[in-house]
Swiss-Prot record:
It comes from Coxiella burnetii (strain Dugway 5J108-111). The keyword Protein biosynthesis applies. The gene is serS. The keyword ATP-binding applies. Homodimer. The tRNA molecule binds across the dimer. This is Serine--tRNA ligase.
Amino acid sequence: MLDPKILRQNLEHVVEKLRRRGFEMDSDTFLQLENKRKEAQLAIQSFQTKRNQLSKTIGMAKSKGENPEPLMAEVSHLNDELKQEEANFETIQKAFSDFQLAIPNLPHDSVPDGKSENDNREIRQWGAPPGFDFTPKDHTVLGERDNQLDFEAAAKLSGARFVVLRGSLARAHRALAQFMLDLHTDQHGYEEVYVPYLVHEECLYGTGQLPKFREEQFQVAGDRNFFLVPTGEVPLVNLARDEIIEAPALPKKWVAQTPCFRSEAGSYGKDVRGMIRQHQFQKVELVQLVQPENSYQALEEITRQAEKVLQLLALPYRVVELCAGDLGFAAAKTYDLEVWLPSQNKYREISSCSNCEDFQARRIQARWRNPKTGKPELLHTLNGSGLAVGRTLVAVMENYQQADGHIRVPDALKSYMGGVDYF
């Protein structure tokens, strides 16, 4: 959520920045709501002043032995009017809050202009795509051996965009997740956290999935108001809800492996085959909570930490800076990591690392105590995929495939795979 002070004091600047990301803010509606809010606030103050004055007059009348009943009746009438105006003010505040919740974050000044992923800017590449003396196969074909990648069984259980993994592929999937967790906890200083996979609606409001992306969420039927997590970012960031963290305890660096559940409502016809786009997938998520002045340094750090997974697996990739028009709703700046897939002869997204500045922190009131002032201030929140496990498995299968259809085990993964060389 944007700072309402910025909206009130520098509306034109906000409108222009939002326009960079293709969002047209309705400034007329904002001004109307703001005027109504001010009018209601003044009316409440006026009623309160009159009531206080009458209360003093009643006290004086009683001290003089005069009948205070007419004045008390007037106070009672004022109280009724005050309650009505307070209810009106709450209605206006709710409309104002709903208006704010629909506004995305402002892009950082360093974010390049652009409308879509076609305008994203490549920052760097690492590794060279492998050369094959045979035509490389798609991961779905490679997975057909021993029926280890079984979409038919998954469809029988759950429908399209699900998968059943068996045997060595299931083990490789588990091994990748364990490898990522060990790297981030042992070498990158993250605390591993196990979190619920069902969260309250307010958690999704806190991180920005709601209200805009409701159709992309899986909501549990019944009266419990639970949602399945679309990303580990949601429970991890919300751990700081209504917290005040002391400065020496920062930065907070949390990592969790969770399933992610997404309806893919806007993805009809995209990646219908294989494991690239699924309703359920595993992801190792990195989250940092930092002091505001350190957040862009933290963004570079979290990106390099996600890159390290790909480097240790020797998977070719590139880093792309998202243009303003391709930014996620809560992000001020984002880097995507894209891994090389031989069967598609192109790079595909495998990680997204974002600085949300104080956008999420304002929604959940996640704060730190500034030792210079002694007062609580909003934190900056960052998140990054470290990595999407299923897509990493796809990349390993395709980049390490052999002519006979077997997959060579990356050196970094051998100890997690029982020391075997191929699967």
